[in-house]
Amino acid sequence: MTITDLSGRWEVCLDESKADALPQKYPDRINLPDSTSNAGLGALNTEMEYGCLTDLHKFEGFAWFRREVEIRPEMSGKNLTLFLERTRKTRVYIDGNQIGEYCSLCTPHRYDLTGLPAGKHELIIRVDNTDYPTGGGHLTSRDTQTNWNGIVGRIELQSYSAYPEYVYAIPDPDKKTLHVRAWIKGAHCGTASLRVFDVTQEYGSAAAEFSDEKPLECDIKLSDSAPLWSDSDPAPLSLELDLDGDRCTVTTGLRRMSADDRTLLINGRQTFLRGKHDGLVFPQTGYMPTDVDSWLKFFETLGEYGINHVRYHTCCPPDAAFEAADILGIYLQPELPFWGTVPDEFGAEHKFLREEGWRMLREFGHHPSFVMMSMGNELWGSKERLNELIAGYKAEFPDKMYAGGSNNFQFVPCVLEQEDFFSGVRLGRDRLIRGSYAMCDAPQGHIQTERPNSVHSYDPLIDEAAALAGTQVIDENGEIMIQYGTEMKKVKAESWDNISVHVPVISHEVGQYAVFPDFDEIKDYTGPVRHEAYAAYKKGLEDAGMLHRWKDFFRASGALAVDCYRRDIEAAMRSSMMSGFQLLDIQDFPGQGVATVGILNAHMKSKGLVTPEEWRRYCAETVVLAELDRFVYSASDEIECGLLVSSTEPGFSAEKILWELSVDGTVVDSGASDIREQKGRIYRAQSVSFTISCDKPTEARLHVSVEGEAENEYTLYIYPNIDIEITENYISGGGKRIEITHDPETAKNGGALCIPTSDENSLPGEYCTDFWCYGMFKSISESMGKPVPTGTLGLLIDNKSELLKDFPCDTFTTPQWYEIVSHSRCADLDGTDIEPEVWVIDNPERRKRLGLLYRKDGAVCCTSRLWEIADRPEVKWFAYSLMEYLGK
């Protein structure tokens, strides 16, 4: 094949009116590949977006691109193809004559220009980013990569005698064979030579005939030395087809992803997906890159945080992403660009989607990293049509694992006959398989509702034969109110609470723990998009007199979010019946209300909240886990601790789990516990127990490890026994007593603690940080008639305050605050300049001044109802610290 690169200078005409006639003038210029917005073309967008990024040169309509191309004499008489790697709807003209039009949102556009005579010709490409045949999901959404217009990948003239338009290889790692199928263009019949190799050697070869009537098809037997491909040992192979001098090389690999009941296997051994959601968010350009180096950098960053899997939400990345994932060992799950209801009979939209799926499989299916595929996001409608769709793909491309969608049917999930894995958030109304949910999707998860612990497992919920029926979910008409995209809708429902799942279970969109924005990121938006929401939040915080605290809010909320993610991930790691999770997200999501839920910002840069090494302690191929039913203890408690390892590492052979308990850097107890039981990837050791003596509140560190493999650490909060009484009227102990009053005036002169009665402006205390983003789910809850989210982001604590002198703590939320927060209503201090000792961090959209412990007009005020939790050791010491200060 001879390639003529058409990248470079093109003339442009932008037409929002979408006139069908060829333009008379092309007033602008652009260097393709690029988008019109990134090139700064079109009018400046004066409409600022606050629920997503603002595209400074937003353009929707026809973009006409023109340039001269030359067909050299040696190209004349050969087959000639115009190749456009990634674009929108296109139409092509040569010398003023329409050649054709094409619509694929996920795959290259190819135009047959065979027969074009030698010489110079006018080439015009019209790109239309309106009226797509489907909604497009994250492929065309302003919430992710923007609805760009342009051509953002390779632009080429390809000339050849014969060439495979598509090449597909079905690997059989057991037999060490590749079954190759190729669709040949340009020759009526012939013989192709095939060989498989890598940089070190050739592993096999074959010859195969082809004709117009049938594709090329053959088996290539590989040598025993041919390596297998997996996440832990990626070994991509090159497959070359030689068609009488016209050569084509694609990447393939020997791998099989399969299932044994609920266990996910790679090449016959267990694997576990440590995944992230991805919507192709690249704010620097507003569209995804199409070069391998950019994707290597992207996946290498993910690998630093232990991620081995990416689920593409209603989108499909370009070939370069698969190529990079092949090299680094990342499991990819592209998805049809659809988010909605599947009809009983396919109309134009679903016929397009079906064909788009075929195009995705034929274009990218040879890549070993392409292991899974989903039919869309949160689908409703016809199970029969979904089954048929999967069955068709599976018959031709059997080496993929398929799901009817991600989190289909929501409250009433099912497993379709053709599905190879289940991706969802629940197996019934109360069978919850992730740690957090929006209020409109209640009941909420264990991270939101349980005292912090490290024992929660999803196994009883996955294995449960029957679940409690959600009597309040399905109405008398058999309908259910659900979140539908970013809005709400009623759909027909069936009762599937008793489903039994015997395919791998993948937890969908895990996390969504909000972090206060990092306003320093504003300066990073130097491309075609701006973060106007951040600017608005910053101005609003300044108007509220709290801008000086934003970095503190950011760090404190971030520390809590990291801990929430950790406990959610560890719950999945502990669950032997779980086969993986897909985080939403370690990367911020700049749309759908602006969801700052990442430990990385939208540019994939670290926020400085957690190091990769710290994150990999609980998100890696091998993770050591301690099981503790709580993290707060009395000094007299005997602490029971389970010890286990989750490992899918080939050759894992540890025999013991080592544990070490330290206080103030001094080891006070240690041991080695024999691994006695294995259940799949879970290796369980003998439990241990210990006590920690102390005469003052103490933090202890429990360090667990397996020699040479992995380590983890847990913080325990230990409180000595103290003789203190807490009632609704007083706190007393050690000969001291302070009164509790509900009137700040009474507490002005000291000697009394004000615990004010809640008013309509106070908010319920919540330990966990907000889910996703306040604005979006407040709107959805109101539309559904459901409770609105509280919307707070944890605590910011002045841990040097005299009020907390006898209650040592950090500056952010930790488990010792769980009971105190959960039994409080935070005070609304708007209109004051009070700087609380314990702030409750509000979300940046509402940005109220909220306090749990603060001073007002000389009175010390605490909004926690301490008498309700008077038996808790940490509460006794918190009350003691307040009493010591107020009793002076």
Ranges and model annotations:
Residues 92-94, 177-209, 216-218, 637-674, ...:
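Beta-strand-rich binding/interaction modules
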Residues 115-120, 183-260, 694-724:
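Extended acidic/polar, glycine-enriched regions
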Residues 42-70, 78-81, 88-93, 100-103, ...:
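Active-site-adjacent substrate/metal-binding segments within catalytic domains
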Residues 730-776, 857, 862, 885:
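Short alpha-beta junction capping motif
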Residues 396, 584-647, 657:
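Aromatic-rich peripheral "rim/lid" segments of glycoside hydrolase catalytic domains that contact
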Residues 309-600:
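Substrate-binding/catalytic cleft of secreted carbohydrate-active enzymes
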Residues 4-18, 35, 55, 59-164, ...:
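Accessory beta-strand-rich segments of carbohydrate-active enzymes
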Residues 459-489, 778-873:
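Catalytic beta-strand/loop cores that center a nucleophilic Ser/Cys/Thr
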